[in-house]
Amino acid sequence: MRFELEGRIIFSKDVSEETQKDIIEVLENGDIFLKGVPEGKENEASKIEGYEFEGKDLKLNMTSGTYTRAHEGIVRLKKPIMEKVGRKHQIGIRDVAIDTYVVTITATPSKVAELKGLKVPECEVELDNEKIKILFKNLGDGELKRNIIDRAIKFVKTELDKQEQDLTFEVCKIAPGTIVSDYKATREITFDKDPTELAEPYGWVKRFPGRGQWFYTAPMAKLFRAFESLIVEECIEKVGFDECLFPKLIPLDVMYKMRYLEGLPEGMYYVCPPKREPEMFRDFVNEMMIKKEIPIDKLKTLLRDPGYVLAPAQCEPFYTFFDHELVDVDSPSKFFDKSGWTYRWEGGGAKGLDRVNEFLRGECVWMGSPEFVEKVRDDTLKYAEKLAEKLDLEYWTEVGDDPFYLEGRKNEDRGIEFPDVPKYEMRLWLPHVKDERKGVAVTSANIHGTHFVEGFGIKDYKDRKVWTGCTGYGLSRWLIGFLAQYGYNYEDWPEIIQKKVGKLPEIPKLITWP
């Protein structure tokens, strides 16, 4: 894909010549756009092709490939510019505006021709032989925050790939996105702020240097544990799960058997064990001490090939436990784990407290007959909905379009049995999103059919059908949904939460933070 942007960063006052000089230093630092870009793909990151100052405006012409796309690049400039000139020149940034933006997707002429007459909201589409051009005009900060550009691109690519849709659309008997249940809060929801924007000023979280990671301080940690306890008591224990402690460092061979490497290989953290050669590491340390920087290239030579991933799904050890074992579906298994973090590489998609690379969940996994597996899935979802109603949290449940074990996969050649609905997803309403009814996914209830049973060679001793299922209760997202509807005022919280939390602890007392 090719991205071409003409836009403006709009300041709070006219930009003086001295301020311009400092801003130009930032603009000429191309490294700003290289964070998160894979080695060898630097030429696909954002580039500033030209710029001009006019009154309060910094006019920019930018281009990019698929990494740090131009509309992400112009937003990424805000922080380093403000760090450079904000306090020094007493100037702020009022808005980011995109005047024109052209996204070009290349495909075969026959596929492009199939899109004739395609209408996409809030943009225009032009077709030209092998090129699909998506044209945007007059986009502001609000449209960027609503991800209009990404949604339009996804919509066009989905139309383009309809003949090669993910297995989800082939398998699912109910259209993904269909709402199957919902609940309206009985109280008036008056809080309408973005909980992420308030969490740090209140001292409940602090940004961690890693992308998509946060330091959760004592008040937030107390709320985490309150929700964890509630979910265990009100959902997990009522379905009769037994707690286990699952490993979080997963061998690549396990991910291969799960076929996760086929569907979402770009969504994991890969782990490279070090070579046990102290002398070579001594050289690494010496160079670091002298240069006062980490010699990354030397470090690469001291690492073995990737052998593991950090658990991206949390349920991986369950299937390994039963690898090539004989089971009895009359004695089904129900395990749950809440012992640590789950990791997914969201790349540029990581944002706020709801879309993070490191998050906590209560993960339930079970195995048994198809009827048993379907009933357990329904129960795990039912109790999650009851908990939301008990807390008077507005929610809806829909048919999911991205079961983790099918995501990104186009075909299945093993004759696997799939359920009629692989995934239900429960979402808590986010009142602060004004332009659409948006929710944060807090519970994902999945049935895998025989997908993992086949992959791990699991059989019933009487050769009866064996299915598996898993439900993830996303603690991080339950918190965000709760705070989005109730806010941070303890007195406004429902009594059940107040009792679980007890007295809220103090935030850390620092001179310079929060």
UniProtKB/Swiss-Prot annotation:
Its cofactor is Zn(2+). Its EC number is 6.1.1.11. Signal peptide: none annotated. One of its GO terms (molecular function) is zinc ion binding. L-serine binds at residues 313, 344, 361-363. Transmembrane segments: none annotated. One of its GO terms (biological process) is seryl-tRNA aminoacylation. Pathway: Aminoacyl-tRNA biosynthesis; selenocysteinyl-tRNA(Sec) biosynthesis; L-seryl-tRNA(Sec) from L-serine and tRNA(Sec): step 1/1. It is found in: Cytoplasm. InterPro entries: aa-tRNA-synth_II/BPL/LPL, Ser-tRNA-ligase_2_arc, SerS_tRNA-bd. Catalyzes the attachment of serine to tRNA(Ser). Is also able to aminoacylate tRNA(Sec) with serine, to form the misacylated tRNA L-seryl-tRNA(Sec), which will be further converted into selenocysteinyl-tRNA(Sec). Belongs to the class-II aminoacyl-tRNA synthetase family. Type-2 seryl-tRNA synthetase subfamily. HAMAP family: Ser_tRNA_synth_type2. Consists of two distinct domains, a catalytic core and a N-terminal extension that is presumably involved in tRNA binding. This is Type-2 serine--tRNA ligase. It comes from Methanococcus maripaludis (strain DSM 14266 / JCM 13030 / NBRC 101832 / S2 / LL). The gene is serS.
